[in-house]
Amino acid sequence: MASLDRVKVLVLGDSGVGKSSLVHLLCQNQVLGNPSWTVGCSVDVRVHDYKEGTPEEKTYYIELWDVGGSVGSASSVKSTRAVFYNSVNGIILVHDLTNKKSSQNLYRWSLEALNRDLVPTGVLVTNGDYDREQFADNQIPLLVIGTKLDQIHENKRHEVLTRTAFLAEDFNAEEINLDCTNPRYLAAGSSNAVKLSRFFDKVIEKRYFLRDGNQIPGFPDRKRFGGGTLKSLHYD
């Protein structure tokens, strides 16, 4: 297979929210049979057709970096984890729809990844305390994905999805809610698949067509997989 240009997308969120299952579904188009805790970082690759169906169509590698650990980790752990945040082109924030704390912690994950966890006292963890000015100048494309949609009782679904809609709005991001054990949520032509493709297109545009310093500062184009593993590819 010919070498392709690539972009790096972080997949962040609390342990147990289903990041590994999500990445496997995105890259292999299959349900992950035996999910396990991610230690360090695991890297999988998806092949994406930018502007599919247009004269500008071009194929890219999307590197999905599944970062393990807890957002409340000691500073030494955060320092070690920071190596994975170099030269990032996009961020997928993952939370468990049945666990409100995992949603609140996305603010802390995003601040950590964007190297802004040393500003203001009292890390922001709730929608009510969130200051959008913190991200006013952020140019890194974000996508919010809620997992375990199947575990929300029907009479609670409206309440939960209304709350998560505000969460995505805070990040100026689109949201996708799904069940990682059911591939139909990302079926070709579905609204979720369209949102996902639009996000990847935006990441590619920021990386290759808008050269104005939008990346997180780091080592330009250096591939640092750390303890991660490079796995097989999935075509859109």
UniProtKB/Swiss-Prot annotation:
SUPFAM superfamilies: P-loop containing nucleoside triphosphate hydrolases. One of its GO terms (molecular function) is protein homodimerization activity. GTP binds at residues 16-21, 148-150, 179-180. Keywords: GTP-binding, Nucleotide-binding. Residues 1-236 are annotated as: Small GTPase-like. Signal peptide: none annotated. InterPro entries: P-loop_NTPase. GO terms for biological process: B cell differentiation; intracellular protein transport; natural killer cell differentiation; protein stabilization; regulation of protein lipidation; regulation of Ras protein signal transduction; T cell differentiation in thymus. GO terms for cellular component: endomembrane system. SMART domains: RAB (SM00175). The keyword Protease does not apply. The keyword Nucleotidyltransferase does not apply. Homodimer. Interacts with GPR89; the interaction stabilizes GPR89. Interacts with RAP1GDS1. PANTHER family: DRAB5-RELATED (PTHR24073). Belongs to the small GTPase superfamily. Rab family. Required for KRAS signaling regulation and modulation of cell proliferation. Regulator of KRAS prenylation, and probably prenylation of other small GTPases. Required for lymphocyte development and function. Not required for myeloid cell development. This is Rab-like protein 3. The gene is RABL3.
